[in-house]
UniProtKB/Swiss-Prot annotation:
GO cellular component, one term: cytosolic large ribosomal subunit
Subunit structure: Part of the 50S ribosomal subunit. Forms a cluster with proteins L3 and L24e, part of which may contact the 16S rRNA in 2 intersubunit bridges.
Lineage, broadest ranks: Archaea, Methanobacteriati, Methanobacteriota, Methanomada group, Methanococci
GO BP terms in the entry: translation
Protein name: Large ribosomal subunit protein uL14
Highest taxon listed in the record's lineage: Archaea
Single GO molecular function: large ribosomal subunit rRNA binding
Role played: Binds to 23S rRNA. Forms part of two intersubunit bridges in the 70S ribosome.
Length: 132
């Protein structure tokens, strides 16, 4: 895992629903925790593009539903600024399910993957068809 190049806005707090962008059988995920989050009193933990979160599978195949799994956020609706001054936002909030080490469990990723997530997680960048 590598450090993030730009300052990502943490716009997905606990309880946020994400689209599962891989072929593991999960369709919708809910964020239940953010790994390595250090916050303040009464503030919800939140993650953004490139962060590892723990999710509960809300919709999907019967084998996948109700499981708690680690995932990496690859797209977010809230725009964030890159170091070169450009602003990036996507049309949905999406994540891919991974192992605790960061290698994806699925064999393909649907849709674009943010450059920040691809740089930080080499396993995700190997499966990404579009890096934006």
């Amino acid at each position: 895992m590598k450090g993030l190049g730009s300052n990502i806005v943490r716009s997905l707090p606990n309880g946020a629903r994400l689209v599962c962008a891989d072929n593991t059988g999960a369709k919708e995920l809910e964020v239940i925790a953010v790994k390595n989050y250090v916050g303040t009193v009464r503030r919800l933990p939140a993650g953004g593009v490139g962060h590892m979160v723990f999710v509960s599978v809300k919709k999907g195949t019967p084998e996948m539903r109700k499981q708690v799994l680690p995932a990496i956020i690859i797209r977010q609706k809230k725009e964030y600024r890159r170091a070169d001054g450009t602003r990036v936002k996507f049309e949905d909030n999406a994540a891919v399910i991974v192992t605790p080490e960061g290698t994806p469990k699925g064999s393909e990723i649907k849709g674009p993957v943010s450059k920040e997530a691809a740089e930080r997680w080499p396993g995700v960048s190997r499966l990404a068809k579009i890096i934006h």
